[in-house]
């Protein structure tokens, strides 16, 4: 079984489950993958608790151990910022935990030349903790929007998705996407699991979607999870 530690936020966890089901859609119920979603919505807010490291870590460990206890073979976390705690979390849990940033890096390495400009849209916490820079800085030029766009476009869009206002979120993210396209990024990582919900919900960004510039870490993680699941 696949263990999914959700609740960071709830919409992102459900989005992951939906993608997991669509990837391996079967004609019978028995052909779908078995998974456990723990929507642990009481995990302390990641961006606000970077300095209270162990508050978040302890809650993540508790969630992972529950999935481990329920016979899951491996765990995924549909939250980019949560991977700031990944290294310590992995030490405290006996079953494997897939790394979303690492999988995104490996996929990008297959599709982009070395030193390519790669855009990232994410929370300020994901940017400040450098969970993607850890992998990308060696071989790519990772760029993000300026402070004004981060505040008024990216942060706003993420907040709107969490509130369930998807149409407003899609409108809010447009300026940040336009900026990264203007500076000719080869790929744009949707480095917050709320952002694909905003971007792919409507017909906007049609040309960009067709060019496959967007990287959806949730979708990528779902694909990797299915491959791993089938090996058990």
Predicted regions and their residues:
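Non-catalytic structural scaffold of enzyme domains
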Residues: 1-232
């Amino acid at each position: 079984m696949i263990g999914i530690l959700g609740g960071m936020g709830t919409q992102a966890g459900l989005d992951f489950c939906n993608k997991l089901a669509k990837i391996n859609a079967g004609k019978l119920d028995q052909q779908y993958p078995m998974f456990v979603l723990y929507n642990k919505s009481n995990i302390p807010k990641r961006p606000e608790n970077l300095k209270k490291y162990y508050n978040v870590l302890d809650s993540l460990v508790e969630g992972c151990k529950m999935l481990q206890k329920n016979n899951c073979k491996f765990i995924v976390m549909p939250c980019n910022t949560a991977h700031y705690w990944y290294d310590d979390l992995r030490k405290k849990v006996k079953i494997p935990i897939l790394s979303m940033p690492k999988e995104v890096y490996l996929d990008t390495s297959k599709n982009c030349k070395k030193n390519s400009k790669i855009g990232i849209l994410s929370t300020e916490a994901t940017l400040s903790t450098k969970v993607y820079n850890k992998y990308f800085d060696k071989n790519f030029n990772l760029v993000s929007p300026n402070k004004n766009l981060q505040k008024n476009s990216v942060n706003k869009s993420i907040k709107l998705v969490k509130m369930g206002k998807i149409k407003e979120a899609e409108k809010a993210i447009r300026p940040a996407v336009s900026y990264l396209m203007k500076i000719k990024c080869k790929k744009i990582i949707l480095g917050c699991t709320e952002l694909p919900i905003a971007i792919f919900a409507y017909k906007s960004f049609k040309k960009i979607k067709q060019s496959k510039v967007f990287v959806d870490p949730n979708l990528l993680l779902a694909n990797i999870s299915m491959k791993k699941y089938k090996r058990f």
